[in-house]
């Protein structure tokens, strides 16, 4: 295992176009879970997440769990990456650093009514 692992948390997702766990019309969905530091037994628990959005109206959160075989309800919010006011479209890039020996990490999207989440990557 390399010292740093880079993973796609969420591939490009555009409102109205079905891709991955997004059906093209839902206002809320979760990405697939990906392995965090805790899965590999890393002791530092440092994660960095990069997010790019274009004309987004919605909320994007990072969630994690310490459970090895989690149910959807086992995930907790770690950070809110971007949150629009429901009418103003946001175009920006974000970096989030957080520490925790999370076994699994995922992205939770809600209030998604327009725009694109260009991609979300994680390094740990």
Where are the regions a protein language model picked out?
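Beta-sandwich interaction modules
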Residues: 27-30, 34-44, 77-124
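Residue-level detector of short, conserved catalytic/binding motifs and their immediate flanks
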Residues: 47, 60, 105
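Short edge beta-strand/loop segments characteristic of extracellular beta-sandwich folds
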Residues: 48-52
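Short proline/glycine-enriched turn/loop motifs at strand-loop junctions of beta-rich domains
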Residues: 54-59, 112
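Short, surface-exposed beta-strand/strand-loop-strand elements in extracellular ectodomains
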Residues: 57-78, 119-123
């Amino acid at each position: 295992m390399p010292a740093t692992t880079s993973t796609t948390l969420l591939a490009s997702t555009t409102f109205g176009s079905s891709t991955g766990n997004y059906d093209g019309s839902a206002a809320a969905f979760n990405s697939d879970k990906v392995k965090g530091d805790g899965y590999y037994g890393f002791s530092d628990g440092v994660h960095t997440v990069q997010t790019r959005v274009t004309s987004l109206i919605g909320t994007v959160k990072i969630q994690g769990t310490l459970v090895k075989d989690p149910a959807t309800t086992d995930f907790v919010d770690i950070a809110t990456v971007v949150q629009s006011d429901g009418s103003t479209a946001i175009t920006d890039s974000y970096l989030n650093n957080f520490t925790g020996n999370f076994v699994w990490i995922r992205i939770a999207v809600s209030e998604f009514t327009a725009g694109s989440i260009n991609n979300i990557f994680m390094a740990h």
